[in-house]
């Protein structure tokens, strides 16, 4: 963890999300488990909630989501991988009835997508003392941290530093040192007021895994 800078800007917390596999579900349904091309806000909030020891349904997760803004930069986008799972046996439907013909086995093919060998830089800013609370939780997490799914373990500590050297999230995305040297152009995703496109990755109080919408823009990182 690097030291805090001396400039008088709002503190920004930086994460490095790196591992053999990551999966940030955005439109997962039943036997199809997709991954977004970058970490979702709900996924990042879930990672922080694990560090804080907040269980699913805890109202403080919703408060956490509302208190922070994030931006994500793809320093190494990774390769998309699809893992196929076959389940054979007596399979029950949601209402407890046997799927298929009585006494006969059924087969379900499921699809799970992952990003291989990706590296993402996440910048987080927030209200009050929320950044310091997140930093302390990530320094000594209550529960294990994972990259979207519990099977996706980070290959290094995710916390980089808290810095006040950057004027904004956009400034941080453009100037923060890249996690990996590359001649290829890199992009970042940042929240937008009106332009851009919609992502459904805002934590809500609705029952089940229902998410709200936010607008984001995809921009090329300038670098230094």
Say what each PLM segment does.
Residues 1-5:
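Short, Lys/Arg-enriched N-terminal segments with co-localized hydrophobic residues
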Residues 6-29:
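N-terminal, Lys/Arg- and Ser/Thr-rich interaction peptides
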Residues 7-9, 64-66, 114-116:
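Solvent-exposed loop and beta-edge segments used for protein-protein assembly and interaction
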Residues 12, 67-69, 117-121:
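Extracellular structured ligand-interaction cores
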Residues 15-22, 42, 103-108:
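Membrane-targeting and insertion segments and their boundary/processing signals
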Residues 15-16, 49-53, 99-104:
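A short linear-motif detector with a strong N-terminal bias
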């Amino acid at each position: 963890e690097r030291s805090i800078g001396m400039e008088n800007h709002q503190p920004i917390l930086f994460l490095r999300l790196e591992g053999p596999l990551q999966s940030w579900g955005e439109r997962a349904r039943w036997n199809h488990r997709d991954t977004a091309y970058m970490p979702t806000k709900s996924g990042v909030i879930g990672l922080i909630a694990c560090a804080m020891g907040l269980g699913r349904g805890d109202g403080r997760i919703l408060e956490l989501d509302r208190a922070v803004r994030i931006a994500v930069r793809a320093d190494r986008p990774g390769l998309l991988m699809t893992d196929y799972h076959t389940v054979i046996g007596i399979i029950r439907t949601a209402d407890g009835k046997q799927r298929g013909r009585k006494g006969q086995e059924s087969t379900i093919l499921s699809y799970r997508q992952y990003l291989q060998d990706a590296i993402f830089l996440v910048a987080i800013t927030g209200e009050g003392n929320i950044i310091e609370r997140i930093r302390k939780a990530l320094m000594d997490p209550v529960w294990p941290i994972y990259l979207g799914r519990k099977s996706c373990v980070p290959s290094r500590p995710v916390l980089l530093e808290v810095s006040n050297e950057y004027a904004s999230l956009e400034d941080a995305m453009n100037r923060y040192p890249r996690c990996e040297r590359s001649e290829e152009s890199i992009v970042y995703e940042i929240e937008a007021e009106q332009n851009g496109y919609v992502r459904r990755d805002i934590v809500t109080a609705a029952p089940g895994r229902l998410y709200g919408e936010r607008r984001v823009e995809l921009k090329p990182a300038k670098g230094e």
